């Protein structure tokens, strides 16, 4: 990727990469190799504009790839509403693949806002579908890490009256906050209602929260739907799928140390949840990192003037993921 500044118009031309992890789609901007001199206000404005599906490219967020003093690279993610997220599992898979190919390595360590993660190449989850694994170890059930104002140190299968009297939630932090409820049937309207409450009831959740409903299909398959903080109802949220896997193991719906197929509206991933002798959780998080198209975006004083896209380079892997998606629909019922 490279930057081209047209002196006559003060327009900065930025190359972009559209990518997705299980349908959770992003625009990737490479600040590692290019000094764009973007400040956070500009990053926020880019996210709000570029993620608008009606007017621009559309997406759930912007992935900024930067240099790191402690890892191979750093990921920052700004949601579609302009807020910055601490972590995004689906986005991290895309950034991980990008940095792996950029540095010609088999694995890389990526710094995020509050932690760091190893990302490793894996055998394709489906023919032609590029796949990586993230080692997720930054897991906490302490309500202070969300933060959540609750009477006990942990919230495990209990109600939060301010949000709902119907569902039993478990609180999990994977550097970003999650409330997980295991349900018999996923009601999207109720999920949205609770998700909105969870992000507006600051007395309970001062920094908001991601809310997920989990339907257990059988002892090795679950289906997850998520209301994502800063996004809304989403096809996929990587850390929500990770948190849902942990909660499903705690509830003895699936087993620790066994592969779990986690389905959602965007496709499927695999997880393996581990619990050590000290009660600490870690997760192998395995899924696609699909590149969709390359393009350019012209930026004039934080305002996007126009953009172009070229879908030809990644057409084959996009088609492969579409085949994989149809395959997952047959197996998640």
UniProtKB/Swiss-Prot annotation:
Q: What is its main location?
A: cytoplasm
Q: Name one Pfam family in it.
A: DAP_epimerase
Q: Which GO terms describe its molecular function?
A: diaminopimelate epimerase activity
Query: What Enzyme Commission number(s) appear in the record?
Result: 5.1.1.7
Gene3D superfamilies reported in the protein's UniProt record: Diaminopimelate Epimerase, Chain A, domain 1 (3.10.310.10)
**InterPro entries named among the record's database cross-references:** DAP_epimerase_AS, DAP_epimerase_DapF
The active site annotation covers 88, 237
Q: Report whether Transferase shows up as a keyword of the record.
A: no
Superkingdom field = Bacteria
BP GO annotations:
lysine biosynthetic process via diaminopimelate
Name the pathway. Amino-acid biosynthesis; L-lysine biosynthesis via DAP pathway; DL-2,6-diaminopimelate from LL-2,6-diaminopimelate: step 1/1
Residue sites binding substrate per the record: 24, 79, 89-90, 176, 210, 228-229, 238-239
Q: Where is this site: Could be important to modulate the pK values of the two catalytic cysteine residues?
A: 178, 228
Subcellular localization is given as: Cytoplasm
Recite the UniProt keywords alphabetically. Amino-acid biosynthesis, Cytoplasm, Isomerase, Lysine biosynthesis
Q: Which GO terms describe its cellular component?
A: cytosol
Which principal EC class is assigned to this enzyme? isomerase
Q: What does this protein do?
A: Catalyzes the stereoinversion of LL-2,6-diaminopimelate (L,L-DAP) to meso-diaminopimelate (meso-DAP), a precursor of L-lysine and an essential component of the bacterial peptidoglycan.
What does the annotation say about its assembly with partners? Homodimer.
Q: What is this protein called?
A: Diaminopimelate epimerase
Which source organism does the UniProt entry give?
Clostridium acetobutylicum (strain ATCC 824 / DSM 792 / JCM 1419 / IAM 19013 / LMG 5710 / NBRC 13948 / NRRL B-527 / VKM B-1787 / 2291 / W)
Its gene? dapF
């Amino acid at each position: 990727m490279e930057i081209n500044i047209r002196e006559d118009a003060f327009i900065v031309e930025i190359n972009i990469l559209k990518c997705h992890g299980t349908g959770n789609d992003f625009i990737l901007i490479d600040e590692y190799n290019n000094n764009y001199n973007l400040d956070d206000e500009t990053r926020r404005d880019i996210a709000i504009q570029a993620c608008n599906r009606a007017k621009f490219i559309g997406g759930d967020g912007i992935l900024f790839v930067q240099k790191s003093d402690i890892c191979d690279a750093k990921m920052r993610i700004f949601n579609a509403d302009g807020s910055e997220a601490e972590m995004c599992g689906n986005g991290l898979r895309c950034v991980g693949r990008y940095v792996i190919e950029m540095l010609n390595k088999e694995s890389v360590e990526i710094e995020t806002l509050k932690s760091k993660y190893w990302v490793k190449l894996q055998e394709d989850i489906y023919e032609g579908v590029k796949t990586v694994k993230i080692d997720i170890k930054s897991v906490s059930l302490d309500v202070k890490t969300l933060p959540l104002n609750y009477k006990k140190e942990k919230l495990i299968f209990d109600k939060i009256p301010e949000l709902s009297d119907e569902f039993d939630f478990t609180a999990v932090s994977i550097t970003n906050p999650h409330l997980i409820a295991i349900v018999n049937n996923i009601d999207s309207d109720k999920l949205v209602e609770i998700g909105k409450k969870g992000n507006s009831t600051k007395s309970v959740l001062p920094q908001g929260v991601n809310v997920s409903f989990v339907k257990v299909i059988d002892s090795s398959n679950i289906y997850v739907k998520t209301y994502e903080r800063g996004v809304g109802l989403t096809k996929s949220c990587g850390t929500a799928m990770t948190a849902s896997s942990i909660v499903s193991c705690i509830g003895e719906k699936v087993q620790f140390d066994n592969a779990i197929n986690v389905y959602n509206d965007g496709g499927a991933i695999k997880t393996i949840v581990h619990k050590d002798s000290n009660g600490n959780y870690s997760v192998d998080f395995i899924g696609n990192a699909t590149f969709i198209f390359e393009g350019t975006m012209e930026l004039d004083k934080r305002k996007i003037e126009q953009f172009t896209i070229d879908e030809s380079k990644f057409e084959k892997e996009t088609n492969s993921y579409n085949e994989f998606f149809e395959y997952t629909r047959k197996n998640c019922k």
